[in-house]
């Protein structure tokens, strides 16, 4: 609104001084020319400075301080709107009279098909726009942004039907949902006491201990380490007076297998497999020009200065003299009957895992590795220890004839 016209309509001489807080600005030259073309202002007013006011502020001022003027102004606006609608209707009726055409009855079905086709195209475009451009919308009543729900596969009704006892509400109550555990799974659960430790990933590399610590543990006797010994259950199966072949030393209690310090670091070995019994027809591995990992000599000479064949690991390229590995002749003949593993590749026969080296012990007859917790032992036994695969049959007792009543006593 123009400030000059408002002040004239309200009868206020100095409108700017009376209402200085109203927002106002000066009209540009183009705006004055536009108002002159609409006959809103005169040519004299076009040369003068004119000021524009905000319409909403002026109407609020009229409602508060000039209610009579505002009522008169509202009536004038309604008359103008009514006149505009009437003029628009007259123009529309004149256009209809000028463009009046008679529609043939035979073309009505064609027009109906065209109208239906256009309506279908409009609906398809509207739905496509909703799905691509306006998927989410803001709900003015709840002030929540509504997002379309994703598509999910629906199961058949019989698969999702709830039973009469779906879940126990109190401890000990019957329910139809339960899990059946296999014997191997139950060994990991603490029913009375868990028999197995948490399973380890077989693909994880085994932790290798330092070689210096192995040498230090060799002289500790029955202390922790990869020692071999006899448990109470198997100590009676081997006689203490049983002799050993000449040239072989009796293994010390609690001894450990010396690690191959000078051997090259082994590469990624293939997946290990548990070997519980001798493999029929097994042929030992043959590596020409192999060197012992301890004394760094071939089969022509050992650390004792004698020619001695080497034993080879079935998993890697490590080799060693039986005397350097503290092996007896019986043990050497036994390890040739199955794929023998060196200390670097040794795995448990029961679980097939190389982990928990501090709990690994070895049979004194076949040199197979076992975890203490896999065979039900709480700790590594001291002395000699023999696995179940190598347990010897107990000696058959000799039959002694009964003495008669008339027998003589010597």
From Swiss-Prot:
Residues 257-271 have a biased composition (Basic and acidic residues). GO terms for cellular component: chromatin; npBAF complex; nucleus. A zinc finger (PHD-type) spans 291-348, 350-393. Residues 1-97, 204-246 are annotated as: Essential to induce neural progenitor proliferation. Residues 1-207 are annotated as: SAY. SMART domains: PHD. InterPro entries: PHF10_PHD_finger_1 (IPR038045), Znf_FYVE_PHD (IPR011011), Znf_PHD (IPR001965), Znf_PHD-finger (IPR019787), Znf_RING/FYVE/PHD (IPR013083). This is PHD finger protein 10.
